[in-house]
Amino acid sequence: MRNKKIFIALFILASTLTFGQAKTAEIGFITDNDLYTSSKNDMYYTNGLELFYRFLSKNNNEKINKKITEFRIGQYIYNPRFINAEAVTINDRPFTGYLFAEAGRSFFYQSESVLKTDFQLGFMGPNALGKETQESFHHIIGYKEVFGWENQLHNAFAVQAHVMYSKKMFPSKYNDFIDLHFQSEANLGTIFTGVSTGFLTRIGFKKLLPIYDSNLHDASVSFQPQYNIREFYFYAMPSVNYQFYDATIQGSMFSNTSPLTFDLEPLRFNAEFGLKYRHNNFNMSYSFIYRGRELRDPETNTNSGYFYGSIRFGYLLK
């Protein structure tokens, strides 16, 4: 009996030490697909996959709670609404893929403001392997065959910069279960150039963590030991986007040899909402994302707003 009590005590102590250790890094993935919202949906931004690794960086600024460095690799795939053999000549968006590597740094302030910056290098076009990835994925899951990749956009080299700033609204009126943030971001590069602005709210099923400890903007890593951390909330983020340039629609800015391109619909309304959860070392989320109409297609006039789902999973490391 005594040995049993000792074993239980040691198990509890080991569990406490394991979950109470500082977690200074996180590894994980993000997968996007329109099938996560509807089995009948397979158009426009149709698939995305990102692998990430982030870690805490040295910080000597008293106004900054955390400084986080992050690396990612990812691939996005785009196709028109119709991908059957009979509709190869009916296109309301180009086929293309985008493959990239990314390095970024995030600054989480004591005021719960956030500044994120990142840079990408990569390729759009055949070098991005969108055709091979989509055809293999459809074959594996037994989904319909895709026709039309012979019309995909030609190669373009990607150099991208991105910045996002978020500011907590009404910081003096603290509430354990709801908050509101103003958020703006900008992209500049050879593939995407545009700006977005909007509002984001969290509604907690449990007491909300401060933004600099929350997984909302990927700040779960910490130098401080954390004990039995739980986070579970709904979030919503409506925004307005003005897109100046999009190579996945217009083709490369350095050539006009692609077989099929379109003019942009520059002003769009976008929305995102979902659930985010954390239990100790595990982060996970599901998001439903809506994108407004992105281009003008006078010949077919079928392009419209669309939606897709995003699933994220991360694991915190020592």
Question: Predicted segment positions?
Answer:
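Bacterial Sec-dependent N-terminal signal peptides
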Residues: 1-25, 313-317
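N-terminal ordered "arm"
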Residues: 22-66
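Transmembrane beta-strands of outer-membrane beta-barrel proteins
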Residues: 25-29, 69-73, 115-121, 161, ...
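Outer membrane beta-barrel transmembrane domains
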Residues: 37, 81-82, 206-318
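Solvent-exposed loop/turn segments connecting transmembrane beta-strands
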Residues: 38-44, 112, 154, 184-196, ...
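Feature captures outer-membrane beta-barrel proteins of Gram-negative bacteria and organelles
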Residues: 47-56, 161-167, 195-205, 271-277, ...
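Glycine- and aromatic-enriched membrane insertion/assembly motifs of diderm outer-membrane
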Residues: 51-80, 123, 280-284
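Outer-membrane pore/translocation modules
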Residues: 73-100, 106-216, 220-223, 245-263, ...
